């Protein structure tokens, strides 16, 4: 893991993250103009960072937040589509991989159902090699339709990459899911605003440490007339230490080289903090000393997760018993969310 240079090597993947200024757009034409600005920025960055293999732009950087519902539906994109075609051309021209935001991607039942909040990973040939739909939209504000799975893709130089979006990253489960599928770099694109800056910076570092993985965070910056976005895009090592972090500046860029051999060596040979290995080999030292085998215990000891998998409704009722049983809150209503119990559709 190296920071401070503009290079990369056969063993390192040069990764850049961008504090893209949150755009305020209203029409498809404005969105496509912004796509061209992103594409131009990517090509320019490659000339300044010749080692750059992968660049990450924040959530909402393509379309901004459409606060008008009709504008949201009117500008919802397809994947592939006009927006991704512009990004693909830039990736081909620069010979760079890129992560881009599509907010939103048309639902299969568009326009009867809300769009998805989507990320795409595009390779240096312009091919879309991963499309991820946000599993945990930022309720109660975000009205995106939720996705249902994570992915791992072999990225530049073979580094294994998963994509997650913003509020996804507040749930340890999604990081673990990506890591256990083999992700070595988890990319978190976010359009996070104040007040939760400190918490989001902390979460990314903690999840890198807990999952023995690299983390790349790209966050929006600036003010869009509604929210103030705190930036702090960052690259974090698999030991939880920050390699590089921007401030709050609009269009700030950070860059680091992520060693492929280092993370694979650590996962194979580290012991006391090898969290992925130890989770499925619980207590192996004591089990070995007892003469009960030398691989520890693999069974899941966490009753809540067992219940969630076998009886999701009962797990939901258990959560509601310690929180609330309505999605809305009477003292702080958001939109039309119900504040009284309703029947499931």
Swiss-Prot record:
The keyword Plastid does not apply. Its EC number is 3.5.1.4. InterPro entries: Aliph_Amidase/BUP, Aliphatic_amidase, C-N_Hydrolase, C-N_Hydrolase_sf. GO terms for molecular function: amidase activity. CDD domains: aliphatic_amidase (cd07565). Residues 13-260 form the CN hydrolase domain. Pfam families: CN_hydrolase (PF00795). It comes from the Bacteria. Keywords: Hydrolase. It is an enzyme of class 3 (hydrolase). It catalyses: a monocarboxylic acid amide + H2O = a monocarboxylate + NH4(+). The active site is at residues 59, 134, 166. The keyword Cell membrane does not apply. SUPFAM superfamilies: Carbon-nitrogen hydrolase. Belongs to the carbon-nitrogen hydrolase superfamily. Aliphatic amidase family. Catalyzes the hydrolysis of short-chain aliphatic amides to their corresponding organic acids with release of ammonia. This is Aliphatic amidase. The lineage of its organism: Bacteria, Bacillati, Actinomycetota, Actinomycetes, Mycobacteriales. The gene is amiE.
